[in-house]
Curated annotation (Swiss-Prot):
EC nos: 2.7.1.170
Stored Pfam families: AnmK (PF03702)
PANTHER family cross-referenced by the UniProt entry: ANHYDRO-N-ACETYLMURAMIC ACID KINASE
Protein family (similarity comment): Belongs to the anhydro-N-acetylmuramic acid kinase family.
Annotated positions binding ATP: G10, T11, S12, L13, D14, G15, L16, D17
Gene Ontology MF, one: phosphotransferase activity, alcohol group as acceptor
Keyword ATP-binding: yes
Gene: anmK
The keyword Kinase is assigned to this record: yes
Protein name: Anhydro-N-acetylmuramic acid kinase
Length: 363
């Protein structure tokens, strides 16, 4: 039996998900802890997602704050479980993505793994994306191999959809290599718009979006972004889809009621997921949804309506809490790194071949 901890801080910037898993050899979720992102740290990290002055110093300060928060959560989880640090084989720390530009040959996740090792006394595996990018890949999404390991126990074809800040699909089909790609904005624009208009962190259950009406001209303008017509492998991030991007489209369109903008953004998320699934010519019988989007009743309902021949449900249908899938994935990726197991999938990222992912910081 080996215990690993996964730490995930996604593009939604709402907080840190920390998952303790057991790998023996089947994977089991043992315990979890969620640490909300302080507003000051969230602002620091958001500021690093766009060009600005003194980025190197600001990045160093922000990652110091990030890693202190992560270490606090990990140590609290160990205390809660009455586990000494030496019982944990490794921490898989994704860090916080502040830039992702694989077309230019780089991806940047900050998180100071050396300090995380010092603050926890546990070996840390981090920097999972850069090896795939160095091998010509997108460096994302990395979770399809984990989705395959976790959800390929039953016969039939299925897709696993993660809806965090951005949405990505993993296609798990009989006698085919796993496929996967980013679809586009997940919650990132929905969250940004409700924060700007109503000072709320997110649209609970999609209620505000459900109160509005889709604006067809705005929707078509948003869908005209070149990313959506790009064939995979592909990935995206806040460099492309952000509040400034949305506001440029809104200025071109004129006045639209705020709730109608939210309804249109939800439709954008749903349509780009469905169109991505259809363009992949996937013979999918079920769509399993994880991430924050699994709790958005309006989004789940829209996906079900657009995919009448597909069973749409949360990953909870497989006994896996949708909130913890990504943190579990990075714990699993740490296991793969220490065991020398290649965890990227060239069919997903476009890399030149299989690669062992991650850099190791021994305790």
């Amino acid at each position: 039996m080996a215990l690993y901890i996964g730490v995930m801080s996604g593009t939604s910037l709402d907080g840190l998900d920390i998952a303790l898993i057991e790998q023996s050899p089947a994977l089991r979720l043992v315990a979890t802890r969620y640490i909300p992102m302080p507003d000051t740290l969230r602002a620091e990290l958001l500021g690093l997602c766009a060009s600005g002055p003194d980025e190197i110093a600001r990045s160093a300060i922000a990652q110091q704050h990030w890693v202190e928060l992560a270490a606090q959560g990990i140590n609290q989880l160990l205390q809660q479980q009455q586990l000494p640090p030496q019982d944990i084989r490794a921490i898989g720390s994704h860090g916080q993505t502040v830039r992702h530009e694989p077309s230019r040959g780089f991806t940047v996740q900050i998180g100071n793994p050396a300090l995380l090792t010092e603050l926890t006394g546990i070996t840390v595996v981090s920097d999972f994306r850069s090896r795939d990018v160095a091998a010509g890949g997108q460096g994302a999404p990395l979770v399809p191999a984990f989705h395959e390991a976790l959800f390929d126990q039953r016969p039939g074809n299925r897709a696993v959809l993660n809806v965090g800040g951005f949405s990505n699909l993993s296609l798990i089909e009989t006698a085919k290599p796993v496929a996967g790609f980013d679809c586009g904005p997940g919650n990132v624009l929905l969250d940004a718009w409700i924060q700007a208009q109503r000072a709320e962190n997110f649209d609970r259950n999609g209620q505000w979006a459900a109160s509005g009406q889709v604006d067809p001209p705005l929707l078509q303008a948003l869908l005209s972004d070149p990313f959506f017509a790009t064939q995979g492998p592909k990935s995206t991030g806040r460099e492309v889809f952000n509040l400034d991007w949305l506001q440029r489209h809104l200025r071109a369109r004129g006045a639209i009621a705020a709730e109608n903008v939210q309804a249109t953004l939800l439709e954008l998320t749903a349509l780009t997921i469905v169109e991505s699934l259809q363009s992949a010519q996937s013979d999918t019988q079920e769509l399993l949804v994880c991430g924050g989007g699994a709790h958005n009743a309006a989004l789940m309902g829209r996906l079900a309506a657009l995919l009448p021949q597909t069973r749409v449900s949360s990953t909870a249908a497989y006994g896996v809490d949708p909130d913890w899938v990504e943190a579990m994935a990075f714990a699993w990726l740490a296991h793969c790194c220490l065991e020398g197991i290649a965890a990227n999938r060239p069919s997903v990222t476009g890399a030149r071949g299989l690669r062992v992912l991650g850099a190791i910081y021994p305790a």
